[in-house]
Amino acid sequence: NTDVTYLESGEKKYGILLDELKKAKKFIFLEYFIIEQGEVWDSVLEVLCEKIREGVEVRVMYDGLCSLSKLPIGYFKKLRELGIKSKPFAPARPFFTTQQNNRDHRKILVIDGKVAFTGGINLADEYMNIVERFGYWKDTGVMLKGDAVRSFTLLFLQMWNVTEKNIEGYSRYLNVAIPTPETAEGYVMGYGDDPYGKERVGESVYLHMINTSTKYLHIVSPYLVIDNVMMSSL
């Protein structure tokens, strides 16, 4: 019961994402590895502020390394002043520890528990090819509408609560009436890793898909950094 729209570029995602954000009625959850000030984020932030004025709950979580180059130090405080619940995940420290490698690489947007975006596209101008860093940047994503969105709502809340002393209940965000899409085909399940878990969920999913493929295997990624295990499976 989930409709999937393939977003073949950052430019495609950008326009659709803004349109869906403007439809939000109850809550908006954003969890991104990279948020960078610029045309893209300024446009998104403008909509978020508009939604705050309408009474929509908005939360923004970004990886702590953004404060080293992408965002001002303490940027989450500015967002809080705007009425947005915000926090950096694993803030960067002036001293090195092994926990500095515990990064939040997710790119998740959930709207009202009914619409979700995920994929490899961050909220920065280079991902939409508004500015150029390494030539034309090719990355992809998907928009989901239907039952599978609950998985992404839960993934966000679980990561949000990692640093919370008082763990809130999830029911009011998960018990959402989701209409069945007319074009839903196949089976969709959201999944995710986190820096604190010992099980490599993402790697296991990829290896299973590779090892059980019988007709074709298509892989698209702007990064190709694979280990010996995956190379052997391929």
Task: Name the predicted role of every residue range.
Residues 1-234:
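Charged, low-complexity intrinsically disordered terminal segments
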